[in-house]
Amino acid sequence: LAFFDVVGKPIAVRSSSLLEDSHYQPFAGIYSTYMISSLDDKNEMLRLLLDAIKAVYASVFYADSKAYMTATSNVIDQEKMAIILQEVVGTQYNDRYYPSFAGVGRSINYYPINDEKAEDGVVDLAIGLGKYIVDGGRSLRFSPRHPNKVLQTSTLDLALRDTQTRFYALDMNRGEKPFSIDDGFNLLKLSVRDAEKDNSLRLMVSTYDPVDQMIRDGYYDGGRKVVTFANILQHKAFPLASILDSMLTIGSREMGRPVEIEFAGNLVGSGNTPGTVYWLQIRPIVDMKEMLSDEVMDLPDERTILKSNTALGHGVMDNVSHIVYVKSSSFKSSNNVNIAREIEKINRTFTEREENYILVGPGRWGSSDSSLGIPVKWPHISS
């Protein structure tokens, strides 16, 4: 109870395990993470905390976790876990709580564009809680060493179509709601318009002018607000890009290999402090030479099934014997959940045979938004 009094804010309950932080085959996002609202009734808050700790431990045995362990040749007996309690970064706006921004950064980028280099790193950035990025939402992707070059905002059509429109916040009203194994049971998925009402978007958005058919950097009355982070990335109202570059550089140097970090920040500063970035987590990335090599095998056309001059990334897999293809004509948001179930059945068959396959289809794989892609999870595609 004294811990609650000292923190005075919502608490994140998350795992820290041997397999998650392994230098040889790390994985993240497999186990559950819960957020507990700050309540006046500390005994009720303690009950929620105890339930959350039990649920995080129990998530080791969920189907998603077991499927991932099987796919990576790990066994539950090898796993050891501690629980971390972290203050949730954010600001309370009436009955909801969320940070100005959250994101994931990687010190190595397998998909550089133009004059970017793999070692320049890459960041996925979004308004609100980081769950939006983990769930495959439309985050803003950029290299911290090239903050002026953001592909998603390079044209008007891309900016209106491929930028963030939703975000997650913690519901501060649901302390008495029955606890659930769904770690998002007390989270709200809101529209960016809701954040506009909170007056929390000033530095993160630009304004679309439908009359002149252009996007103006900055927040102006009227017009659709487009999440571009232009004031921060291009106009340097807050030195986020350089901060993230330093974090990735230091993390890679100290861990002796590429790293992935999670971070969040508040731009509601006090006094002369414009804002604060919080380093939430760091883990190693396993890098393979094949994934960075620019050399592509020159195969004759008669031995080539699919070829592209605009593909991103590199990789070599020599143990694939099947192709599963989802036809573009079948891609409909109303049908994508059913397609995910069918893929799960196919995946189960290949898992039992101990055979691997390539999965090809339209849209964004693994997105929680079925209008963007087929919402598969690890148990669906573990082979």
Task: Describe the residue ranges of each PLM region.
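Conserved mixed alpha/beta core segments that line enzyme active sites in large multi-domain catalysts
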Residues: 1-383
